[in-house]
């Protein structure tokens, strides 16, 4: 993130960053993963498909009806190859979690500043994330409701929005 290898596509609000940073600091943990994506790499897809042929380590459905299935990559050679291929991915993109990412970075920077002999390998130098290739995502609309036109007529409001966006 600090080296611009994790790309953001939306602005964050300082008050939300502050709140998330306080939460991470109080808990001394990032409790919710950031959702990242990358341009698919055929070899990574192949490894995932291979691992998924085995029985999962965890296969649960939460009370809200969402299924979670987890496999573990145990083969050391395969792990090394995955690390090498992921190191070759030019960028990751935040699909969900801009405020969590910003808070994790702020937390890490504060801990780094308070740790004079930091090596760069401390737990605060990373944050929890899930990563999916772009070809396995379905991007759905995320719409906002405008309740106050701030004194503008609907036509004026749409004209203002049209200055920045395609309508």
Segment roles from a protein language model:
Residues 1-167:
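Surface-exposed, charge/polar-rich loops and edge strands
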């Amino acid at each position: 993130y600090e080296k611009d290898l994790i790309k953001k596509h939306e602005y964050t609000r300082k008050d939300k960053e502050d709140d998330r940073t306080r939460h991470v600091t109080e808990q001394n943990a990032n409790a919710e993963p950031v959702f990242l994506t990358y341009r698919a790499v055929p070899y990574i897809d192949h490894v995932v498909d291979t691992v998924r042929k085995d029985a999962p380590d965890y296969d649960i459905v939460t009370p809200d009806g969402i299924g979670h299935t987890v496999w573990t990559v145990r083969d050391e050679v395969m792990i090394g190859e995955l690390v090498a291929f992921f190191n070759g991915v030019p960028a990751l993109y935040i699909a969900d979690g801009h405020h969590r990412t910003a808070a994790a970075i702020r937390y890490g920077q504060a801990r780094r500043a308070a740790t004079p002999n930091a090596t760069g390998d401390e737990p605060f130098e990373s944050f929890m994330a899930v990563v999916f290739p772009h070809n396995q995502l379905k991007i759905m609309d995320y719409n906002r409701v405008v309740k106050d036109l701030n004194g503008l007529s609907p036509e004026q409001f749409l004209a203002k929005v049209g200055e920045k966006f395609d309508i």
